[in-house]
Amino acid sequence: MTSSNDYSLERLADRAAITDVMYRWCRAVDRLDVDGIRGVFHPDAIDNHGPFVGGVDALIAWLTDRHRGIPFSMHLVSNILIEFATADSALAETYIFATLRYSAEGKAALAAFTGGVAGGAGAATDSLSWARYIDRFERRGGEWRIARRTVAFDSSMMMDVAENAPQFDPNWAVGRRDKDDPIYKERAAIGLPA
């Protein structure tokens, strides 16, 4: 049950701050931005990502290693339901749809994540997952961050990528999984930290 205080101006600002954390997570993981990943968690946070359970530094090491063979990653979030337990703690349930393209060389990471299933041999595979982030948020020092995350997996599927799949024109702005992505160039161009 919600109270009228759940929608006060202060609470609306809290909801917006928590939602921004979710969006920053998506950008950081999709661009493999280690500082961005670290920035959404409290230093003592615990993440339960299924095959990985541990602290923030170990999560970053696990993601960096696992994503080495993933040239494309896109996390889309929706249905962000935020419930406040206290003035400085909240529970957020966020629906997620993630598409990750595993290169033929990166399939060992896919097999480790899917119990041995990794798509057809010799071809890239797109993994599509539907899940929910169940995040315990805490405001410390005036900043909302994740204190504990559990990823609840709901469904998934895989599709092999055809060898003749369309390629983008190299002159276009094309997404990258590093600080050379167009978003970081635009951030720097207007004076935001890259």
Where are these regions (language model features)?
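Short, low-complexity N-terminal intrinsically disordered segments enriched in polar/charged residues
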Residues: 1-27, 31, 39
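Transmembrane beta-barrel outer-membrane domains
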Residues: 16, 71-73, 126-128
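Short, hydrophobic/aromatic alpha-helical segments in well-folded domains
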Residues: 21-24, 36, 40, 78, ...
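Short beta-strand segments enriched in hydrophobic/aromatic residues
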Residues: 29, 41, 96-98, 150-153
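A solvent-exposed, acidic/Ser-Thr-rich amphipathic alpha-helical stretch
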Residues: 34-115
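Short beta-strand edge/turn micro-motifs at domain boundaries
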Residues: 89-93, 123-125, 130-163, 169
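Mixed-charge, low-complexity intrinsically disordered segments
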Residues: 102-126, 175, 182
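Acidic/histidine-enriched, glycine/proline-rich intrinsically disordered or flexible terminal extensions
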Residues: 160-194
